[in-house]
Amino acid sequence: MTTSAQILPLVKDPERLEARLSEIPPEPGVYFMRDGSDRIIYIGKSRKLRSRVRSYFREGYNKTERIATMAKLVTEIEFIVTDTEAEALALEANLIKQHQPYFNVLLKDDKKYPYVCITWSEDYPRIFITRKRQLGKEKDKYYGPYTDSGLLREILRISKRIFALRQRPQPLFKDRPCLNYDLGRCPGVCQQLISPEEYRKTVQKVAMVFQGRTQELIDILSEQMEKAAEALNFEVAARIRDQIAGLKSLTAEQKVSLPDDTVSRDAIALAGDAQHACIQLFQIRAGQLVGRLAFVAESHAEPGAILQRVLEEHYQTAESVEIPAEILVQHELPDAEILADVLTQLKGRKVTIFTPQRQVKAELIEMVERNAQYELQRMQKLGDRNHQATQDLAAILDLPNLPHRIEGYDISHIQGSNAVASQVVFIDGLPAKQNYRHYKIKNPTVTIGHSDDFASLAEVIQRRFRKYAEDPQLSRVGNPDWPDLIMIDGGKGQLSSVVTVLQEMNLLEDLRVISLAKRREEIFLPGESQPLKTDAEQPGVQLLRRLRDEAHRFAVSFHRQQRSDKLKRSRLDEIPGLGHHRQKQMLAHFRSVDYIRQATPSQIAEVPGIGPHLAQAIYDYFHPSHL
């Protein structure tokens, strides 16, 4: 078997690099950086493409470690020329959103701050709090990230009390609504007792709360209440009155003293150290603080450039009504006029961006900056603890470098049933939940009454690293997906099974793998019969313990979910041709599966949508001895 020659990075092929750079024009546009696997790893914009791209490869140019690493991986450069800088800015935002290049992740998605998600992609949208943005469904809308998860949950709780919303992701019963419907808390979504169109109107009202348009919603409801009262529809008027009272209670404590209370404005500021910048964005609508969002970025640029990138990423998914008329910034932005023009086009009205110098607006920026400083201090304390733990772990295991990415694996089952595995990831000592994975064990020898943790772990590791075994040329240096350390929950036996499979895949030399036994927190290394001599209270051991406990928690929760789904599954699901809608028709007619079992084919055929042929198939399913 032959393999294609590996493409050298451009930094190792000066002639090809210079030829490629000379092809790039000195015009505004967007550029792409690709690695040896043809993946887009970075997207940028510039008013002069050639000089900007050349700067990445210039000796002595002031580059951060992250950007220097990126430049070493680049094997191809592409570009798109635009007429104006504003067009380049808008195009860059769309392309970053589409491709999500690794080195473009300026805003760290460490799931520290929660979002509110509204699933507009569904007929009956759900509203829930999440710490992970799923980018696959463009119709779904995310609001946040919010700094105060407790306040966010309270707002959502009150919103669900004010408006009748679906309370469950899945129906509790197949043939009738649950108690929430009887209490007026849900309009009976599970039984489609409300049309999707009417329900979406209700959800849109809740969306206005998270868009900072609470006062606008109150005005709309007040007008509806007056019309209902004039029509002598006092029951509807009373319900709307209660909704207005609930909405006013949401904003009663959020008043901010500002001039021009009718003007919507955002205020953004940051506080940073050599590594990170903590950014706070306050959303003020009609004089009320309706949202306080937080971001974490790397401090590899000037403060104004960081603020601009945050604003670009924040507003690129915003609806026009969510863009404020004024944006107050702590530092001048490098391309403030261009960003203002882009936002003006999106909003359809004038948007201004400026740095306030005095009076109330300047005091507002100072308040936002103080909040950013408090968040930075909290983050530094946490970072010091984790840095100390990774240093200690590197010393314990004699690692050449601090372990940046550590992966932990665990197996969960009950006597072999519903066997699953977890893969959790810690980045610089912190859980990176966006990188978590779970696996359903496929090994046919793992069945009810017969568990095999060794074989299960071997299967999971093989599935995790299969692409690297199949393609030895796949880049590992600088690859964010490649772990610096693997920890297995278990003892010598579990570790041995993983070592064996990594040897078979020719990957053992490139991976450091250990196991952590629950008893006495013992660390085992490959080929060693005795555990390392460590103190259970050492920072490095405590880090491994946190990783092990998190892997166990994630595995157990997924196992419980699998068991719950299996228990909820109806016997009707096993009948070919009997979809969800027909199942609902059957249960509505017969009230239970037991009555369906007792019915004759002719009685089953009386159900709307069930013909004689399907009725016979249903009867035969419950009476196999009849065949």
Curated annotation (Swiss-Prot):
GO molecular function: DNA binding; excinuclease ABC activity
Keywords linked to the UniProt accession: Cytoplasm, DNA damage, DNA excision, DNA repair, Excision nuclease, SOS response
SUPFAM superfamilies tied to this protein: C-terminal UvrC-binding domain of UvrB, GIY-YIG endonuclease, RuvA domain 2-like
Compartment annotation: Cytoplasm
Cellular component GO terms, alphabetical: cytoplasm; excinuclease repair complex
PROSITE patterns: GIY_YIG, UVR, UVRC
PANTHER family referenced in this protein's UniProt entry, alphabetically: UVRABC SYSTEM PROTEIN C, UVRC/OXIDOREDUCTASE
Family: Belongs to the UvrC family.
Purpose: The UvrABC repair system catalyzes the recognition and processing of DNA lesions. UvrC both incises the 5' and 3' sides of the lesion. The N-terminal half is responsible for the 3' incision and the C-terminal half is responsible for the 5' incision.
Annotated protein name in UniProt: UvrABC system protein C
Organism: Nostoc sp. (strain PCC 7120 / SAG 25.82 / UTEX 2576)
